[in-house]
């Protein structure tokens, strides 16, 4: 049986994959997903079942860096949706991002937290309105343990510099990027492509989409690609 393990990004949760899970399960795939537990859901780190068949990782944004190395290294194929090797690139763009991340970190656990999260999620949704995204439970508050995980992952976001540990060198890779992404800067998008082997990498640039490339059209694209990665 073919398997999928999916990973959401910073300030997300596994419910973002609900339509994706339904689609892949209807096609006979086994589905599991990372849950970091920022909000009310319990954390969960998935693992591959001992089954024959294809092992496909689908990761949105920071999700590529949140997967256990043992999961990533056993993948036959990887789909990166608005992902990156280094979120903060060298140079002026990186300096500006570093300042922004420190500002976000300073808001966590304060009265400024809801506004910071709402601004971040609005940038994720852009060029669409925030209402185009599923309701995010973080806007209703967090437990201290979930906030700490969010803080830890913000540090990871600032310091990741390369493809994550356990990267499967022989895997086929699909990179989907939104040309209007307001979260991942163009330099970081380019660096990801430079870090991947061209002969095994399929790059799709979506001119009308932003950071939240977990749309029905992208789901259709990924399902087609997974049939012949």
How does the language model describe each region?
Residues 58-67:
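Gly/Ala-rich beta-loop-alpha elbow adjacent to hydrolase catalytic centers
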Residues 179-184, 211-212:
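Acidic catalytic loop of the alpha/beta-hydrolase fold
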Residues 205-220:
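Catalytic histidine-centered segment of alpha/beta-hydrolase-like enzymes
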Residues 171, 185-194, 218:
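Short alpha-helix in the alpha/beta-hydrolase fold that links the catalytic acid
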């Amino acid at each position: 049986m073919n398997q999928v393990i999916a990973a959401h990004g910073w300030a997300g949760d596994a419910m973002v994959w609900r339509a994706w899970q339904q689609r892949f399960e209807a096609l006979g795939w086994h589905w599991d997903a990372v849950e970091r537990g920022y909000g009310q859901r319990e954390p969960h780190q998935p693992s591959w079942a001992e089954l024959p068949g294809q092992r496909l990782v689908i990761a949105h944004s920071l999700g590529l860096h949140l997967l256990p190395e043992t999961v990533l290294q056993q993948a036959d194929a990887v789909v990166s949706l608005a992902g990156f090797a280094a979120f903060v690139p060298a140079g002026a763009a990186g300096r500006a991002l570093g300042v922004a991340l420190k500002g976000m970190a300073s808001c966590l656990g304060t009265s400024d937290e809801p506004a910071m999260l709402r601004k971040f999620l609005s940038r994720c949704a852009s060029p669409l309105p925030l209402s185009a995204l599923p309701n995010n439970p973080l806007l209703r508050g967090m437990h201290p343990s979930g906030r700490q995980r969010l803080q830890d992952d913000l540090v990871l976001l600032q310091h990741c510099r390369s493809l994550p540990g356990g990267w499967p060198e022989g895997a086929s890779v699909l990179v989907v990027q939104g040309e209007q992404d307001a979260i991942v800067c163009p330099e970081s998008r380019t660096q990801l492509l430079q870090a991947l082997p061209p002969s095994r990498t399929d790059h799709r640039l979506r001119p009308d989409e932003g950071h939240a490339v977990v749309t029905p059209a992208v789901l259709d694209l990924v399902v087609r690609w997974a049939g012949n990665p």
